[in-house]
Regions:
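Generic structural signal for short, solvent-exposed loop/turn connectors between secondary structure elements
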Residues: 1, 131-134, 366-367
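N-terminal type II signal-anchor transmembrane helix
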Residues: 2-54
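Short non-domain terminal segments
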Residues: 6-10, 135, 163, 306, ...
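N-terminal hydrophobic or amphipathic segments with adjacent small-residue motifs
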Residues: 12-17, 66, 136, 345
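Bacterial extracytoplasmic/cell-wall-associated proteins, especially those involved in peptidoglycan
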Residues: 20-27, 156-159, 171-367
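Signal peptide-directed extracytoplasmic domains
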Residues: 32-222
Length: 367
């Protein structure tokens, strides 16, 4: 009996010591302020009874919203802004959670992307790490600048519109003379072809001009060095390479065919034959048929009056018609050596093509 009593007393003492250590830790966490310590513990007890509110998001709409914390914003200011954007139900509950978790002094200034499916804890921990503040944006191979502008609007996270970016894209290289000179780009050119297809992680404060600079820098990184030197050694400017590569990009389904399709077009150019490239007719039609890349007819080959229509205009079109991939660019710089002058999509829908030397052979491949 005495032994059991001693064990009980020992356990009780250890329990009291544990409580004391925990109390000291919490006291230290409250900056040694006894009033704050007591207040925090009372809030902690209150939150325990409201756990379901903490764990329940305000809605089901997962559309990202831009949310900005300015330098010097207090937890109360942040909470009120979240409430006004309909991201939380209770501003006071958010502030209380920050305080109990020790996050009220950890909020970082920046622009974040939040949605209604996030709980108060989710939002709180997002707002203490500025690394959560970014825009993911993808430019697809074969997209024209109008489609990039549409993607900007569809993304919904940029601080500018697609139309505002279009104004920058259409201005072209007026304030980038060194870039234009390096790649042989005429001063009249837009950014078409140079919005390098890639998935980008961008700062939320990026401007339309900043996006342009990022895309062009990525393009330069991809094509500079040996590729640029090899193109120039063949007597081609990079602008001419990108122009033809944009056509190859729109024609090819499989990257492995890029250098073969490129060889067809280069062979035609060498003998003065028109390129007869369907994508250039589509480009000339703009969005007149409700899509940027419409189906075309035999009549369109002659009736679409555009300098880009390579059925009625010899040589290369005035410039690129879309953003080519690096694979398409390399296909034009390093084409397969062939004696092909024609190609036709295979009838099985595989995306592959049949290549031929003569027009008569080409006709035999018609579906």
């Amino acid at each position: 009996m005495a032994k059991a009593l001693r064990i009980f007393v020992l356990l009780f003492i250890l329990f009291i010591i544990g409580l004391g250590i925990a109390a000291v830790a919490l006291f230290v966490a409250s900056d040694g302020n006894p009033v704050r310590f007591v207040q925090t513990e009372l809030i902690r007890l209150s939150l325990a009874s409201r756990q379901d509110e903490l764990d329940r998001p305000i809605g089901t709409d997962n559309t990202p919203q831009r949310f900005t914390i300015n330098s010097g914003d207090s937890p109360g200011t942040v909470a009120q802004a979240l409430y006004l954007q309909n991201l939380i139900r209770d501003a006071s509950l958010f502030v209380d959670y920050l305080r109990v978790e020790g996050l009220d002094t950890e909020l970082e200034a920046g622009t974040y992307f939040l949605d209604q499916t996030q709980t108060i804890p989710d939002i709180a921990y997002t707002l203490i790490d500025s690394r959560n503040s970014s825009i993911t944006f993808r430019i697809f191979e074969g997209a024209r600048i109008e489609e990039v502008a549409e993607s900007i609007d569809a993304n919904g996270l940029f601080g500018f519109t697609g139309q505002e970016f279009m104004l920058v894209a259409q201005r072209g290289f007026v304030d980038l003379p060194e870039f234009a000179a390096r790649y042989g780009i005429p001063t009249s050119a837009t950014l078409e072809g140079y919005l390098y297809p890639e998935t980008y992680i961008l700062p939320p404060a990026i401007t339309a001009t900043g996006l342009r600079d990022t895309l062009l820098s990525t393009f330069s990184t991809a094509v500079d060095g040996q590729r640029l030197a090899d193109a120039n050694a063949q007597g081609w400017t990079m602008h001419e390479i990108v122009t033809l590569a944009s056509i190859v990009e729109r024609e090819a389904v499989w990257n492995e065919e890029n250098p073969i399709i490129a060889s067809v077009y280069r062979n035609r150019l060498e003998i003065g034959q028109t390129l007869d490239a369907d994508p250039t007719v589509q480009y000339g039609l703009q969005n007149s048929r409700g899509t940027w890349w419409p189906n075309i007819t035999q009549a369109d080959y002659r009736n679409v009056q555009s300098p880009y229509n390579t059925y009625i205009n010899g040589g290369l079109p005035p410039g690129p018609i879309a953003s080519p991939s690096l694979s398409a660019i390399e296909g034009v710089i390093y084409p397969t050596e062939t004696d092909y002058y024609y190609f036709q999509a295979q009838c099985n829908g595989s995306g592959y093509h049949n290549f031929t030397q003569t027009y008569e052979q080409h006709l035999q491949n018609s579906c």
